[in-house]
C-alpha cells in the first residue's frame, strides 16, 4: 500500500481589508491561553507548562505585529499574557486561576494607563479545566469584565477547538485554521488581527462596526485523524470556506471540527460566518453546515489502520523504507500523557528486533527522567539499566526496565529538556526528561539517528506532520490504547450532547439553520 500524496488544501484567500494609520494609533491588547486537553488522559497540566509570555515578550511572539510590519506600525500593541502548553491532560484549577488572574491583573494595569480599542485573544479552544466547563468562554467573560463591552474582540483558534454559543456571543470576530496539519497558523492569526483593525477603523469613520455572527452547531465529533484537509471530504469542505468568505457582505467564515477527546457538552463541530449582511452570512453558514453534514458518513482514517501487531507485520513485509507507524493512542500533540509504555513494550517483545543486525527501528518516545539522569551520568556508549514510562498513565502497561547501550544524549530541548537514545537490539528508543512531540526530521538527526535510512519509524502521533509525511514511503495508523484512543466509543463519553456522530449511527437530520448570535454588547437571549 502506498501513500496517496495529496497536496495540502489550497488556500484561496481574498485580499485582506485595507487599513489606515490614524492620527492616534488604535490600542489593541493581546492575551490568551492555549492547551488542547484530553479528559481521558491521566496527566494534569500545570501553569509552568504554558511557558507564559508577558508584556513585550507577547508582541515578540508574533512577527506580523512587531515594529516595522504593516500591522506593527498601524497599531499600538500591548501584551498582557499568553501561554501555549503542549497538549495534555486536564488543566488544574490552580493553574487556570493563576494564569487567568494574572491576565486580568495585567488587563487592569493596561486599561488604567490607556484606552483600549480592541483585544486579540489567541486561544486553541479545547482547554478543559478541573471543575469548569467552557474554559475559554470563562476566560473571555472575565476579560470582558475588565475591558468592558465597547472594546472589540477578535479571537483566533485551532479548528480542533470548540465554539459554544456563549463564547461566540462574547466575540466580535472569531476564526480558526483551515488546514490540518496546520500550515496556516500565522496566516490565521494575522487575519484575525487585520480584520479587528478594520472594525476599529470603521468605528472611527462613523460606519457600522459590529458584524453579525451566524452560528450553527452540528452533531458531529470526529478525530483529526479522520478529518485532515489533505484528504476528502475535508479537502473540498474547507475549500468551500474561502468561497463563502469571498461573498459580498462576509468578513470571515470558519468551520471547527471540534475536539473529540474531551467530554464536555460544548464539544461538537460548529460553523461560524461573520459579516455585514445578515442574509449573506446566514446562507453562507448554512451552505457550509449542509456540505459538512452531507459528508459526515464519508470521513475515514487518513491512513490504513490496524492493531500494533498488524502494523508491524505489514511494515516488516514491505519493501518501502522508511515505513512509518503512528502509535496514535498516546499522541502527546493531541492530549495523550506521552508516557504509555504499551507500544514500546510490544515492540521490544518481537524477536525480529532482538539482534543489532535486525531491521532498524526508531521509536519516539517515552519519558523516563530517571533513565535520562543515569544516561547523562554514564555517558554515550555506556551500558545502563533503566526504567521508563508509566509514571502518569499505567493503565495500559507498567514501567519498562531495559539494560542497554546509550546511543546519544542531547541537552536543551524546548519540550524534552534532555533526550537520550537507548539501543535495544536493532531498536533505537528515544527517552526524554519531559514529553515531547517528534514532527521534524531534525528531531531525529540531532540524536545521531538517520530516519531516511531506517526501516521502520514509530512515532506517537496521529496524522503525520508535513516533514514526516514527505519522508514516509509508506505509513499505517496503529489503533493503540491511551488518552487519545482513536476508538472514541470505547472511551466512554458521558457528557457530550446526544445524538452525536459517530457515537450514534442513526438519527434524524439536525437543524442546520443559522442562529444569529447577539452582538457582544447585547444580552444573550433565547435557547
Task: Name every feature range the model reports, one short phrase each.
Residues 8-9, 13-71:
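N-terminal amphipathic/basic leader segments beginning at the initiator methionine
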Residues 15, 21-25, 107-117, 311-323, ...:
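Glycine-rich phosphate/diphosphate-binding loops that line cofactor/substrate pockets in enzymes
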Residues 29, 33-34, 42, 50, ...:
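Active-site histidine-anchored catalytic micro-motif
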Residues 40-44, 91, 131-133, 164-169, ...:
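Short acidic, glycine/serine/threonine-rich loops at helix termini
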Residues 79, 97, 101, 293, ...:
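Extended hydrophobic packing segments that form well-structured cores
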Residues 90-104:
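Glycine-rich anion/phosphate-binding loops
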Residues 200-235:
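Internal, active-site/partner-interface "lid" segment
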Residues 225-425, 430-434:
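Hard-cation-handling environments
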Amino acid at each position: 500500500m502506498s501513500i496517496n500524496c495529496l497536496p495540502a488544501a489550497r488556500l484561496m484567500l481574498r485580499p485582506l481589508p485595507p487599513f489606515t494609520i490614524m492620527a492616534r494609533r488604535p490600542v489593541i491588547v493581546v492575551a490568551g491561553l492555549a492547551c488542547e486537553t484530553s479528559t481521558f488522559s491521566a496527566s494534569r497540566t500545570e501553569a509552568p507548562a504554558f511557558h507564559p509570555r508577558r508584556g513585550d515578550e507577547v508582541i515578540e511572539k508574533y512577527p506580523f505585529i512587531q515594529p516595522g510590519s504593516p500591522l506593527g506600525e498601524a497599531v499600538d500593541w500591548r501584551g498582557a499574557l499568553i501561554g501555549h502548553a503542549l497538549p495534555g491532560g486536564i488543566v488544574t484549577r490552580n493553574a487556570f486561576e493563576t494564569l487567568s488572574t494574572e491576565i486580568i491583573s495585567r488587563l487592569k494595569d493596561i486599561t488604567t494607563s490607556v484606552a483600549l480599542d480592541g483585544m486579540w485573544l489567541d486561544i486553541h479552544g479545547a482547554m478543559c479545566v478541573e471543575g469548569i466547563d467552557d474554559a475559554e468562554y470563562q476566560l473571555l467573560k472575565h476579560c470582558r469584565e475588565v475591558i468592558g463591552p465597547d472594546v472589540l474582540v477578535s479571537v483566533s483558534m485551532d479548528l480542533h477547538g470548540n465554539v459554544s454559543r456563549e463564547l461566540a456571543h462574547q466575540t466580535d470576530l472569531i476564526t480558526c485554521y483551515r488546514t490540518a496539519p496546520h500550515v496556516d497558523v500565522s496566516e490565521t492569526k494575522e487575519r484575525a488581527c487585520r480584520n479587528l483593525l478594520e472594525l476599529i477603523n470603521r468605528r472611527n469613520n462613523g460606519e457600522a462596526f459590529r458584524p453579525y455572527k451566524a452560528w450553527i452547531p452540528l452533531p458531529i465529533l470526529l478525530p483529526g485523524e479522520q478529518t485532515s484537509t489533505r484528504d476528502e471530504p475535508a479537502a473540498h469542505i474547507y475549500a468551500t470556506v474561502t468561497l463563502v468568505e469571498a461573498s459580498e457582505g462576509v468578513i470571515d467564515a470558519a468551520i471547527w471540527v471540534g475536539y473529540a477527546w474531551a467530554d464536555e457538552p460544548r464539544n461538537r463541530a460548529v460553523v461560524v460566518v461573520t459579516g455585514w449582511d445578515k442574509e449573506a452570512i446566514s446562507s453562507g453558514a448554512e451552505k457550509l453546515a449542509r456540505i459538512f453534514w452531507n459528508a459526515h458518513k464519508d470521513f475515514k482514517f487518513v491512513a490504513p489502520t490496524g492493531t500494533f501487531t498488524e502494523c508491524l507485520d505489514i511494515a516488516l513485509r514491505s519493501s518501502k523504507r522508511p515505513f512509518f507507524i503512528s502509535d496514535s493512542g498516546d499522541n502527546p500533540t493531541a492530549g495523550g500523557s506521552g508516557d504509555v509504555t504499551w507500544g514500546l513494550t510490544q515492540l521490544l517483545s518481537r524477536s525480529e528486533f532482538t539482534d543489532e543486525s535486525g531491521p532498524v527501528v526508531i521509536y519516539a518516545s517515552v519519558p523516563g527522567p530517571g533513565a535520562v539522569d543515569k544516561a547523562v551520568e554514564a555517558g554515550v556508549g555506556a551500558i545502563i539499566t533503566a526504567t521508563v514510562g508509566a509514571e502518569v498513565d499505567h493503565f495500559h502497561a507498567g514501567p519498562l526496565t531495559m539494560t542497554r547501550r546509550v546511543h546519544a544524549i542531547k541537552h536543551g530541548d524546548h519540550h524534552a529538556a534532555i533526550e537520550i537514545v537507548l539501543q535495544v537490539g536493532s531498536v533505537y528508543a528515544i527517552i526524554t526528561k519531559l514529553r515531547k512531540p517528534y514532527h521534524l526530521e531534525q528531531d531525529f538527526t540531532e540524536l545521531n539517528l538517520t530516519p531516511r535510512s531506517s526501516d521502520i519509524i514509530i512515532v506517537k502521533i496521529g496524522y503525520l506532520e508535513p516533514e514526516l509525511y514527505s519522508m514516509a514511503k509508506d505509513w499505517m495508523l496503529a489503533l493503540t490504547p491511551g488518552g487519545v484512543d482513536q476508538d472514541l466509543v470505547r472511551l466512554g463519553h458521558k457528557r457530550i450532547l446526544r445524538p452525536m456522530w459517530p457515537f450514534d449511527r442513526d438519527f434524524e437530520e439536525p437543524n442546520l439553520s443559522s442562529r444569529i448570535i447577539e452582538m457582544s454588547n447585547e444580552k444573550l437571549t433565547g435557547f
